[in-house]
Structures are given as C-alpha cells and as structure tokens.
Amino acid sequence: MNDVHPPDPDLALDIDGCCRLTGEFTLRSGQVASEYFDKYLFEADPTLLARVARVMVQLLPEDTDLVGGLELGGIPIATMVSSLTGRPAVFVRKKAKEYGTCKLAEGPDVSGRRVTLIEDVVTTGGAVRDATKALREAGAVVEVVVCAIDRSPEGENPLADVGLEVRPVLTKAELDGAR
C-alpha cells in the first residue's frame, strides 16, 4: 500500500472493472494465473490513463531527472507522467535495435542521471530487472520503479535483490478489495 491514498478513491474500482479478466493466463514469468489485469484496457482509455499518471506523479522521487518507460506498457504511462511533470522521458526497449543508433534506451542520454522507471504491472519484476541492469550499465542511477499495479505477494519486494524500491499506484490487494 502506498501513502498517497485516497488521491482518487474510485480508481481501484474503475481499473478493476475495466481490466480484470478471468481464465487461464501464462505470465511473462511462466507462472499461470487464473486472473489477468489487461493493463492495455486502461492504458488505451485517456481518462483512466490520466488518473493513473496523476497518482504516479505523487509517487515520483523529487530528484528524478528522467522518467523511464519500459516497452511496451510503460511507454504510454511514462509519456503522460512526463507531460504532467515536465520531466523528459526515456523509452527503454526490451532489446537494443540492430539498426540506426542501436540504442536500448531511446531519448536523452541517461549517464549520470536519476531515472525513475515507469511500468504497468510488476509481478516478479523480470522486465524491470532487465531494464535496470541495462540502464545502470549505461551510467544511470536507478533506485525506484513506479508501477500502476503491483501483483507481487503482499509485503514482498520482488526487486529488492537489485536494490529497487517499488512504489505502486495500486496493489493486487487493493484491486481485490474494490470488487
């Protein structure tokens, strides 16, 4: 749970109603889940996207130089957060492109800058872990990830092993409680 509640008391209910799907879903981690939060449903809705981004702005560390949107789901959210804060965005690919600039991180140079990662859903943190490693190798200071939904087990930080603090807009428990 984060300490900015209730910035938008109906957000959990609205996100849950829009995005919760039931069935059998294989997650990036290989885990199988009976429920899935289709984050693209809220990311494609400009009103819901803006509401999520406004909460994220409150969760950003004050010393953030760049907001780093992870491909693909973190990019629309990071763009909105960038627009609301005036902080530049950097877009982090899953894999460096093999042509042109051959960059993994598109946008301003990250070297020596504090990058706060923006992600849609964190469960085990695999994509965030990969992006953190790549950005740190490029000279960025990465200490915080702000996510729309934290699906990790309550009370656990799946990214503690890489020294990242996870700051969620909503947790799975908050979404479950909204039903």
Positions of predicted regions on the chain:
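Short glycine-rich phosphate-binding loop at a beta-alpha junction
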Residues: 63-73, 146-147
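Short, glycine/charge-rich flexible loops or terminal/linker lids adjacent to PRPP-binding catalytic cores
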Residues: 77-116, 124-130
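Short helix-loop-beta connector
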Residues: 61-65, 110-112
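Short secondary-structure boundary/capping segments
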Residues: 17, 24-25, 106-108, 158
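Alpha-helical structural signal in soluble globular domains
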Residues: 59, 80-85, 134, 158-162
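PRPP-dependent phosphoribosyltransferase catalytic core
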Residues: 2-14, 133-179
